[in-house]
Design a protein with these regions (language model features):
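Short hydrophobic beta-strand segments that form the core of ligand-binding sensory/regulatory domains
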Residues: 50-52, 75, 85, 94-98, ...
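Double-stranded beta-helix
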Residues: 102-121
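Short, Lys/Arg-enriched, Trp-marked, Pro/Gly-tolerant hinge/linker segments that flank
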Residues: 117-130, 143-202
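Amphipathic, well-ordered alpha-helical segments in soluble domains
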Residues: 50-53, 132-139, 156, 163
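Ligand-binding loop in jelly-roll beta-barrel domains
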Residues: 67, 80-103
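Generic protein-terminus/edge-of-domain signal
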Residues: 1-71, 82, 88, 123
Length: 203
């Protein structure tokens, strides 16, 4: 029986996540971004949690002294409303995962010359939220107050990556009607653009 193929970008992220979860020994410390620093020059802040994974090279967060150099396998978790000032001073391959309420956003950066570059690959995938992802994200947000508890934090992040792999490796549910798909698309658009001014052209 022939396996159903995923779209190319989705398959790329499925393979990337498989490489991470099947080789957990390559994953290192989990760092946490801080809230309340979104006014800093160059800062990036989101309404939803985000996880950055350094696949190769060096990356960093200029807002926190101990996070200015993150190396291969290290991760930066940003709770909702937390901010970071990304550092792309050296070559780096970076996976960034955004956890929105009804969809998962994945971005792959390959900065060969030590400077910020547009995302090479980017997908947004709807997912049925049954509570497991929200529970893990909430636990990580609480654990940001005690970042030294890596023996608890790292297995939790590995579980979160397993969940991401499951979502990315799955095709959309066959029973999704046109109306449901349209509703999900509208929700995604509102979540991304609710703070922008609304006009006929922007819609």
């Amino acid at each position: 029986m022939r396996a159903t193929l995923l779209p190319a970008d989705q398959q790329f992220f499925a393979d990337l996540l498989s490489g991470l979860v099947l080789n957990p020994q390559q994953l290192g410390r989990v760092w946490f971004a801080q809230r309340g620093a979104s006014d800093a020059v160059g800062s990036v802040s989101r309404d939803w949690p985000r996880l950055d994974v350094v696949l190769r090279g060096e990356y960093g967060n200029r807002l926190v002294a101990g996070q200015q150099i993150l190396r291969h396998g290290e991760m930066l978790f940003l709770p909702a409303q937390a901010a970071s000032v990304p550092v792309f001073e050296r070559p780096v391959m970076l996976l960034s995962i955004l956890f929105a309420p009804s969809w998962l956003g994945l971005v792959f950066h390959d900065s060969r010359h030590g400077q910020s570059v547009p995302a090479q690959r980017h997908v947004e995938l709807p997912h049925p939220e049954r509570g497991e992802c929200a529970a893990m994200l909430m636990a990580l947000t609480h654990l940001s107050a005690s970042p030294q508890d890596q023996a608890i934090i790292q297995p939790l992040v590995l579980s979160l990556l397993h969940w991401c792999r499951k979502v990315v490796s799955s095709l959309p549910e066959p029973g999704l009607s046109r109306g449901d798909f349209l509703y999900q698309s509208i929700c995604n658009w509102v979540q991304e653009n609710y703070a922008e001014s609304l006009s006929r052209e922007s819609v």
